[in-house]
Regions:
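Sec-dependent N-terminal signal peptides
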Residues: 5-12
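Extracellular/lumenal mature domains of secreted and surface-exposed proteins
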Residues: 16-140
Length: 140
């Protein structure tokens, strides 16, 4: 009976990542999103860069689709160009997109990485667009 209890305890410790210090969480890549420019006058073409960095490559982050929510009613989907998968490599991937803003506003742009219809990472940044000085449509 003692042997069974000891074996059960060992299996629980291995199967539960919280008890094992959760090393998988420490190796999880992070997604960063940048806009260039972040502040501009309308109309403006904004270039976005999403970088997936750090952690070890895994099937979860291999060949994601990107969903861009431009916060102006527009949305676009981009399929990733996939390098050959090799387990244990460090993740360092860069994705780019561009979007034109024609109206003044504060836009919270969000990119979501999806794999097999499941979100695996997301990041948000803010873009500030002002009307041209002296534009009758600009309110003070």
């Amino acid at each position: 009976m003692r042997t069974r209890l000891l074996l059960f305890s060992c299996l629980v410790a291995i199967a539960n990542p919280l008890m094992a210090g959760n090393p998988a969480r420490a190796r999880r890549p992070r997604l960063e999103l940048r806009a260039t420019p972040r502040m501009a006058f309308s109309p403006v073409l904004v270039f976005m860069t999403a970088e997936l960095r750090g952690g070890e490559d895994s099937e979860e982050f291999y060949c994601p689709a990107l969903v861009w929510d431009w916060d102006d009613g527009g949305r676009s989907v981009q399929e990733a160009d996939c390098p050959p998968f090799a387990s244990g490599n460090t993740v360092d991937r860069r994705f780019t997109a561009e979007h034109a803003y024609r109206a003044a506003g504060v836009y919270n742009v969000k990119v979501t990485l999806k794999r097999v219809h499941r979100s695996v990472a997301a990041a948000t940044t803010t873009v500030y667009v002002r009307s041209v000085l002296g534009d009758p449509g600009e309110s003070e």
